[in-house]
Amino acid sequence: MIRVNNVCKKYHTNSGWKTVLKNINFELQKGEKIGILGRNGAGKSTLIRLMSGVEPPTSGTIERSMSISWPLAFSGAFQGSLTGMDNLRFICRLYDVDPDYVTRFTKEFSELGDYLYEPVKKYSSGMKARLAFALSLSVEFDCYLIDEVIAVGDSRFAEKCKYELFEKRKDRSIILVSHSPSAMKSYCDNAVVLENGIMHHFEDMDKAYQYYNETQK
């Protein structure tokens, strides 16, 4: 289970402190799939970073009794001067996973070929996303964090990503952040809406859609 308790997040800006998340509360059970709807700037990606442990909350707590992925396709943690393979080996040490398996999986899944032996700073954004997604799926987690539905490379590769995540790992928990209600309907059991840093809960997904659509007017 993941429990988010009264979480707030503030950032210091040139004009003073900006509150991005305000008293966020929710729980995610094993196998549950929740969507987080919100327009750009609503705090969705910030919440994902907090849940993954990339950043701490300003106040409140996040309790984790199951393993949580880093945000899928997030390449910000890569060391640009290192090769794709060097970054892969670092992930293996960090998560104590078999480097031979991760190497085989990443080579086959990412389809990056010899670019795996080039510095990541030479990669295009799409290549970085392919590497990040392959590494994310090479390590098994109880809960996967997805910041926007798979938009990596061409449609064939995107479909391969969706199959690996939503079919082969359909027993896992998922938190899917998006501004696309259709994506939520395809992959989630229920949804919440983030609006100006405040989380709104609903009895079912249709009511969440309705509220979200009203906020877009």
From Swiss-Prot:
It is a peripheral membrane protein. Keywords: ATP-binding, Capsule biogenesis/degradation, Cell inner membrane, Cell membrane, Membrane, Nucleotide-binding, Polysaccharide transport, Sugar transport, Transport. ATP binds at G38, R39, N40, G41, A42, G43, K44, S45. It comes from the Bacteria. InterPro entries: AAA+_ATPase, ABC_transporter-like_ATP-bd, ABC_transporter-like_CS, ABC_transpr_TagH-like, Bact_Polysacc_Export_ATP-bd, P-loop_NTPase. Residues 2-217 form the ABC transporter domain. GO terms for molecular function: ABC-type transporter activity; ATP binding; ATP hydrolysis activity. Transmembrane segments: none annotated. One of its GO terms (cellular component) is plasma membrane. It holds the Pfam family ABC_tran. Its main location: membrane. GO terms for biological process: polysaccharide transport. Signal peptide: none annotated. It is found in: Cell inner membrane. Putative ATP-binding protein, and an energy-coupling component of capsule polysaccharide export apparatus. Belongs to the ABC transporter superfamily. This is ATP-binding protein BexA.
